[in-house]
Amino acid sequence: AILQKPAADNGVLPLLSVDEASLSFTYSMADDDKVYGLGENVRGINKRGWIYQSKCSDEPEHLEDRRSLYGAHNFFVVTGKETFGIFVDYPGILTFDIGYTRYSELKITASDWNLDVYVITGTDVKDIVHQFRQLIGRSFVVPKWAFGYGQSRWSYMSEDEIRDVVKKHRELQIPLDSVY
């Protein structure tokens, strides 16, 4: 959700070329450009060289070939020849081909044009992220207990089973803040 939506500029998007036929936006990357963001995903911090999909999925196997994990975080920052951020406000599936098909090309593809694209420029990455947070609002701060260890698995069949898990952690002197 956008807190204070800026006035629409239906003109040319800076830094991106638009292909209406393929519903895509493309940016030409330099050899040393790095791309950060897109939320929680497998692989490294620099997203270059892979394809990511923005769709919410909770798959049990977090393997390198997964293109989506948990949530949709459609914001990323490019650093290199240009430094800028892009936020795509879109409820559908987005594909981010970040130098996978063509190493020099970052391509965002949507399934329809019902989207808003924000190109955020600034003095540095910190400034760009600050502007992004101004656009979407402050991040939720989790409660203190959430920073501790939480034991989780696919299923607990009974309350007794959960109590056994807690008991075993205590026996082994493993700190435990939550079981879910």
What are these regions (language model features)?
Residues 1-144, 153-154, 166-168:
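Catalytic and substrate-binding clefts that recognize carbohydrates or anionic sugar/phosphate headgroups
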Residues 140-180:
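Aromatic-lined carbohydrate-binding/catalytic grooves of carbohydrate-active enzymes
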